[in-house]
Amino acid sequence: MASSSSNRQFSHRNANTFLTYPKCPENPEIACQMIWELVVRWIPKYILCAREAHKDGSLHLHALLQTEKPVRISDSRFFDINGFHPNIQSAKSVNRVRDYILKEPLAVFERGTFIPRKSPFLGKSDSEVKEKKPSKDEIMRDIISHSTSKEEYLSMIQKELPFDWSTKLQYFEYSANKLFPEIQEEFTNPHPPSSPDLLCNESINDWLQPNIFQVSPEAYMLLQPACYTLDDAISDLQWMDSVSSHQMKDQESRASTSSAQQEQENLLGPEA
Protein backbone atom coordinates (compact mmCIF):
# COMPACT_ATOMS: atom_id res chain seq x y z
CA MET A 1 0.00 0.00 0.00
CA ALA A 2 1.07 3.48 -0.67
CA SER A 3 1.05 6.30 1.71
CA SER A 4 -2.42 7.57 2.50
CA SER A 5 -3.77 10.71 0.90
CA SER A 6 -7.06 12.36 0.09
CA ASN A 7 -8.69 14.33 -2.70
CA ARG A 8 -10.48 16.31 0.04
CA GLN A 9 -9.76 20.04 -0.26
CA PHE A 10 -7.32 21.38 2.34
CA SER A 11 -8.30 24.79 3.68
CA HIS A 12 -6.74 27.32 6.05
CA ARG A 13 -8.11 30.80 6.69
CA ASN A 14 -6.91 32.74 9.70
CA ALA A 15 -4.89 35.81 10.61
CA ASN A 16 -3.16 33.80 13.36
CA THR A 17 -1.34 30.69 12.16
CA PHE A 18 0.48 28.09 14.24
CA LEU A 19 3.08 26.00 12.39
CA THR A 20 4.98 22.95 13.62
CA TYR A 21 7.85 21.53 11.56
CA PRO A 22 8.72 18.04 12.92
CA LYS A 23 12.32 16.85 12.63
CA CYS A 24 13.41 20.22 11.25
CA PRO A 25 16.88 21.50 12.21
CA GLU A 26 16.39 24.78 10.31
CA ASN A 27 17.72 27.97 11.91
CA PRO A 28 14.79 29.94 13.44
CA GLU A 29 15.96 33.23 11.92
CA ILE A 30 16.21 31.77 8.42
CA ALA A 31 12.84 30.05 8.83
CA CYS A 32 11.22 33.30 9.98
CA GLN A 33 12.49 35.20 6.96
CA MET A 34 11.29 32.51 4.55
CA ILE A 35 7.81 32.30 6.11
CA TRP A 36 7.57 36.11 6.21
CA GLU A 37 8.23 36.32 2.48
CA LEU A 38 5.58 33.67 1.78
CA VAL A 39 2.80 35.76 3.36
CA VAL A 40 3.72 39.25 2.10
CA ARG A 41 0.37 39.56 0.26
CA TRP A 42 -1.49 39.27 3.60
CA ILE A 43 0.70 41.94 5.27
CA PRO A 44 2.62 40.10 8.02
CA LYS A 45 2.74 41.85 11.40
CA TYR A 46 4.54 39.39 13.67
CA ILE A 47 6.33 36.08 13.56
CA LEU A 48 7.97 33.99 16.26
CA CYS A 49 10.09 30.90 15.56
CA ALA A 50 11.60 28.62 18.19
CA ARG A 51 13.71 25.50 17.89
CA GLU A 52 13.08 22.69 20.37
CA ALA A 53 14.52 19.23 20.98
CA HIS A 54 12.53 16.00 21.24
CA LYS A 55 13.37 13.46 23.93
CA ASP A 56 15.26 11.45 21.32
CA GLY A 57 17.42 14.48 20.52
CA SER A 58 15.87 15.32 17.15
CA LEU A 59 14.99 18.97 16.52
CA HIS A 60 11.66 20.51 15.59
CA LEU A 61 10.50 24.03 14.89
CA HIS A 62 7.44 25.97 16.10
CA ALA A 63 6.24 29.21 14.51
CA LEU A 64 3.47 31.70 15.33
CA LEU A 65 2.49 33.96 12.45
CA GLN A 66 0.19 37.00 12.67
CA THR A 67 -1.01 38.91 9.60
CA GLU A 68 -3.20 41.93 9.04
CA LYS A 69 -5.42 40.03 6.61
CA PRO A 70 -6.41 36.39 7.13
CA VAL A 71 -4.12 33.97 5.35
CA ARG A 72 -6.21 32.04 2.80
CA ILE A 73 -4.63 28.93 1.34
CA SER A 74 -5.85 25.66 -0.14
CA ASP A 75 -2.40 24.17 -0.76
CA SER A 76 -1.21 22.08 2.17
CA ARG A 77 2.38 22.52 0.92
CA PHE A 78 2.25 26.31 0.96
CA PHE A 79 4.37 26.68 4.12
CA ASP A 80 6.99 24.07 3.15
CA ILE A 81 10.53 25.39 3.61
CA ASN A 82 13.59 23.64 2.22
CA GLY A 83 11.65 20.38 1.89
CA PHE A 84 10.26 20.45 5.45
CA HIS A 85 6.47 20.18 5.67
CA PRO A 86 4.65 21.66 8.68
CA ASN A 87 1.48 20.88 10.55
CA ILE A 88 -0.75 23.93 9.94
CA GLN A 89 -3.29 25.05 12.53
CA SER A 90 -5.30 28.12 13.41
CA ALA A 91 -3.97 29.75 16.58
CA LYS A 92 -7.21 30.07 18.53
CA SER A 93 -5.43 31.66 21.49
CA VAL A 94 -2.31 33.51 20.38
CA ASN A 95 -1.24 34.17 23.96
CA ARG A 96 -1.29 30.49 24.87
CA VAL A 97 0.37 29.47 21.61
CA ARG A 98 3.15 31.99 22.21
CA ASP A 99 3.64 30.75 25.77
CA TYR A 100 3.74 27.17 24.49
CA ILE A 101 6.39 28.00 21.88
CA LEU A 102 8.56 29.77 24.45
CA LYS A 103 8.37 27.06 27.14
CA GLU A 104 11.74 25.35 26.43
CA PRO A 105 13.35 26.81 23.30
CA LEU A 106 16.92 26.12 22.25
CA ALA A 107 16.91 29.12 19.91
CA VAL A 108 14.36 31.89 19.27
CA PHE A 109 13.84 34.58 16.66
CA GLU A 110 11.09 37.23 16.48
CA ARG A 111 10.16 39.82 13.92
CA GLY A 112 7.48 42.50 14.18
CA THR A 113 5.23 43.30 17.14
CA PHE A 114 3.18 40.63 18.88
CA ILE A 115 -0.57 41.33 18.88
CA PRO A 116 -2.15 39.83 22.04
CA ARG A 117 -5.76 38.82 21.83
CA LYS A 118 -8.16 41.28 23.40
CA SER A 119 -11.76 41.01 24.48
CA PRO A 120 -13.82 43.09 22.03
CA PHE A 121 -15.90 44.56 24.87
CA LEU A 122 -13.63 44.81 27.90
CA GLY A 123 -10.29 45.31 26.21
CA LYS A 124 -8.63 42.76 28.48
CA SER A 125 -6.12 40.09 27.54
CA ASP A 126 -6.57 36.31 27.72
CA SER A 127 -5.06 36.16 31.18
CA GLU A 128 -7.73 38.54 32.48
CA VAL A 129 -10.75 37.21 30.67
CA LYS A 130 -11.81 33.60 30.48
CA GLU A 131 -12.00 32.65 26.83
CA LYS A 132 -14.95 30.87 25.35
CA LYS A 133 -13.99 27.24 24.92
CA PRO A 134 -14.54 25.98 21.36
CA SER A 135 -17.09 23.23 20.94
CA LYS A 136 -16.15 19.73 19.82
CA ASP A 137 -17.78 20.42 16.47
CA GLU A 138 -15.58 23.47 15.97
CA ILE A 139 -12.48 21.53 16.99
CA MET A 140 -13.24 18.64 14.64
CA ARG A 141 -14.10 21.03 11.79
CA ASP A 142 -10.72 22.69 12.20
CA ILE A 143 -8.91 19.34 12.37
CA ILE A 144 -10.65 18.03 9.24
CA SER A 145 -9.85 21.17 7.25
CA HIS A 146 -6.18 21.27 8.32
CA SER A 147 -5.08 17.62 8.48
CA THR A 148 -3.24 16.31 5.42
CA SER A 149 -2.79 12.63 6.29
CA LYS A 150 -4.31 9.86 8.40
CA GLU A 151 -1.47 10.04 10.93
CA GLU A 152 -1.74 13.82 11.27
CA TYR A 153 -5.53 13.63 11.61
CA LEU A 154 -5.35 11.12 14.49
CA SER A 155 -2.49 12.99 16.13
CA MET A 156 -4.43 16.26 16.14
CA ILE A 157 -7.48 14.54 17.65
CA GLN A 158 -5.31 12.96 20.35
CA LYS A 159 -3.92 16.39 21.21
CA GLU A 160 -7.19 18.37 21.11
CA LEU A 161 -9.63 15.71 22.38
CA PRO A 162 -7.59 13.25 24.47
CA PHE A 163 -10.54 11.70 26.31
CA ASP A 164 -12.56 11.12 23.15
CA TRP A 165 -9.47 9.78 21.42
CA SER A 166 -8.85 7.23 24.18
CA THR A 167 -12.47 6.05 24.39
CA LYS A 168 -13.57 6.28 20.73
CA LEU A 169 -10.37 5.58 18.83
CA GLN A 170 -12.01 2.95 16.59
CA TYR A 171 -14.51 5.55 15.31
CA PHE A 172 -11.77 8.08 14.61
CA GLU A 173 -9.75 5.42 12.80
CA TYR A 174 -12.82 4.63 10.68
CA SER A 175 -13.29 8.30 9.75
CA ALA A 176 -9.55 8.60 9.06
CA ASN A 177 -9.76 5.71 6.58
CA LYS A 178 -12.68 7.43 4.84
CA LEU A 179 -10.98 10.83 4.71
CA PHE A 180 -7.60 9.42 3.68
CA PRO A 181 -8.16 6.12 1.79
CA GLU A 182 -5.16 3.99 0.96
CA ILE A 183 -3.95 4.39 -2.60
CA GLN A 184 -3.97 1.05 -4.38
CA GLU A 185 -0.64 0.29 -5.98
CA GLU A 186 -0.81 0.09 -9.75
CA PHE A 187 -0.58 -3.48 -11.02
CA THR A 188 2.60 -4.25 -12.91
CA ASN A 189 2.43 -7.23 -15.26
CA PRO A 190 5.43 -9.48 -14.54
CA HIS A 191 5.36 -10.76 -18.13
CA PRO A 192 6.58 -8.75 -21.11
CA PRO A 193 3.86 -7.36 -23.39
CA SER A 194 5.13 -8.90 -26.65
CA SER A 195 3.08 -11.90 -27.87
CA PRO A 196 5.90 -14.45 -28.35
CA ASP A 197 7.43 -13.74 -24.96
CA LEU A 198 4.04 -13.53 -23.25
CA LEU A 199 3.42 -17.24 -23.95
CA CYS A 200 6.30 -18.22 -21.66
CA ASN A 201 6.62 -21.63 -23.36
CA GLU A 202 9.59 -22.66 -21.26
CA SER A 203 7.84 -21.98 -17.98
CA ILE A 204 4.61 -23.67 -19.11
CA ASN A 205 6.42 -26.74 -20.39
CA ASP A 206 8.40 -27.01 -17.16
CA TRP A 207 5.08 -27.25 -15.35
CA LEU A 208 3.23 -29.41 -17.89
CA GLN A 209 5.78 -32.19 -18.20
CA PRO A 210 5.89 -33.27 -14.54
CA ASN A 211 2.24 -32.45 -13.76
CA ILE A 212 0.20 -33.45 -16.80
CA PHE A 213 1.94 -35.68 -19.35
CA GLN A 214 4.32 -37.70 -17.23
CA VAL A 215 3.22 -40.70 -15.16
CA SER A 216 5.98 -42.33 -13.18
CA PRO A 217 6.16 -46.14 -12.92
CA GLU A 218 6.07 -45.83 -9.15
CA ALA A 219 2.81 -43.88 -9.26
CA TYR A 220 1.35 -46.42 -11.71
CA MET A 221 2.20 -49.30 -9.35
CA LEU A 222 0.28 -47.56 -6.56
CA LEU A 223 -2.80 -47.32 -8.76
CA GLN A 224 -2.54 -50.89 -10.13
CA PRO A 225 -2.36 -53.47 -7.33
CA ALA A 226 -1.89 -56.26 -9.94
CA CYS A 227 1.38 -54.68 -11.08
CA TYR A 228 4.12 -56.06 -8.82
CA THR A 229 7.42 -54.99 -10.40
CA LEU A 230 8.88 -51.80 -11.78
CA ASP A 231 9.56 -53.48 -15.14
CA ASP A 232 5.91 -54.49 -15.45
CA ALA A 233 4.86 -50.92 -14.75
CA ILE A 234 7.24 -49.55 -17.39
CA SER A 235 6.01 -52.11 -19.91
CA ASP A 236 2.36 -51.24 -19.24
CA LEU A 237 3.02 -47.52 -19.59
CA GLN A 238 4.88 -47.98 -22.87
CA TRP A 239 2.02 -50.11 -24.20
CA MET A 240 -0.58 -47.50 -23.20
CA ASP A 241 1.47 -44.74 -24.79
CA SER A 242 1.72 -46.69 -28.05
CA VAL A 243 -2.00 -47.54 -28.13
CA SER A 244 -3.13 -44.01 -27.32
CA SER A 245 -0.81 -42.54 -29.96
CA HIS A 246 -2.23 -44.85 -32.66
CA GLN A 247 -5.80 -44.09 -31.59
CA MET A 248 -5.17 -40.36 -31.85
CA LYS A 249 -3.72 -40.77 -35.34
CA ASP A 250 -6.75 -42.85 -36.41
CA GLN A 251 -9.15 -40.23 -35.08
CA GLU A 252 -7.32 -37.48 -36.93
CA SER A 253 -7.52 -39.39 -40.21
CA ARG A 254 -11.26 -40.16 -39.80
CA ALA A 255 -12.06 -36.58 -38.93
CA SER A 256 -10.99 -35.32 -42.36
CA THR A 257 -13.78 -34.44 -44.82
CA SER A 258 -11.51 -34.43 -47.86
CA SER A 259 -12.46 -37.16 -50.38
CA ALA A 260 -8.90 -37.19 -51.64
CA GLN A 261 -7.54 -37.94 -48.18
CA GLN A 262 -10.08 -40.74 -47.74
CA GLU A 263 -8.94 -42.22 -51.09
CA GLN A 264 -12.49 -42.43 -52.42
CA GLU A 265 -13.08 -42.56 -56.17
CA ASN A 266 -14.56 -39.43 -57.66
CA LEU A 267 -17.69 -40.71 -59.41
CA LEU A 268 -19.05 -39.02 -62.53
CA GLY A 269 -22.48 -37.50 -62.29
CA PRO A 270 -25.40 -38.60 -64.48
CA GLU A 271 -25.29 -37.44 -68.05
CA ALA A 272 -27.58 -34.63 -69.01
From Swiss-Prot:
Q: In which residues is a divalent metal cation bound? A: E52, H60, H62, E104
Where is motif RCR-1 found? 18-21
Q: What class of enzyme is it?
A: hydrolase
Q: Where is this motif: RCR-2?
A: 60-62
Biological process terms from the Gene Ontology for this record are:
DNA replication; symbiont-mediated perturbation of host cell cycle G1/S transition checkpoint
Q: Which residues form the active site?
A: Y100
Residue ranges for the region (Disordered) are: 245-272
The UniProt keywords, alphabetically, are: Activator, Covalent protein-DNA linkage, DNA replication, DNA-binding, Endonuclease, G1/S host cell cycle checkpoint dysregulation by virus, Host cytoplasm, Host nucleus, Host-virus interaction, Hydrolase, Metal-binding, Modulation of host cell cycle by virus, Nuclease, Nucleotide-binding, Nucleotidyltransferase, Repressor, Transferase
Write out the annotated subcellular location: Host nucleus; Host cytoplasm
Q: What is its EC number?
A: 3.1.21.-
Which residue ranges are recorded for the region named Binding to RBR1? 198-202
Q: How is the cofactor bound?
A: Divalent metal cations, possibly Mg(2+) or Mn(2+).
- Region Transactivation, as annotated, extends over 221-230
Return the GO cellular component terms, semicolon-separated: host cell cytoplasm; host cell nucleus
Keyword Metal-binding assigned: yes
Residues covered by region (Oligomerization):
175-187
Q: Where is this motif: RCR-3?
A: 100-103
GO: which molecular function terms? DNA binding; endodeoxyribonuclease activity, producing 5'-phosphomonoesters; metal ion binding; nucleotide binding; nucleotidyltransferase activity; structural molecule activity
**Pfam families, per database record:** Gemini_AL1, Gemini_AL1_M
Task: Return the Polar residues bias intervals.
Answer: 254-265
What cofactors are annotated for this protein?
A: Mg(2+); Mn(2+)
Subunit (UniProt): Homooligomer. Interacts with host retinoblastoma-related protein 1 (RBR1), and may thereby deregulate the host cell cycle. Part of the C- and V-complexes which are RepA-Rep-DNA complexes involved in the c-sense and v-sense transcription.
Q: Which family does it belong to?
A: Belongs to the geminiviridae Rep protein family.
Q: What does this protein do?
A: Implicated in enhancement of V-sense gene expression. Acts a an inhibitor of C-sense gene transcription.
According to UniProt, the name of this protein is Replication-associated protein A
Organism expressing this protein natively: Maize streak virus genotype A (isolate Kenya) (MSV)
User: Source organism lineage?
Assistant: Viruses, Monodnaviria, Shotokuvirae, Cressdnaviricota, Repensiviricetes
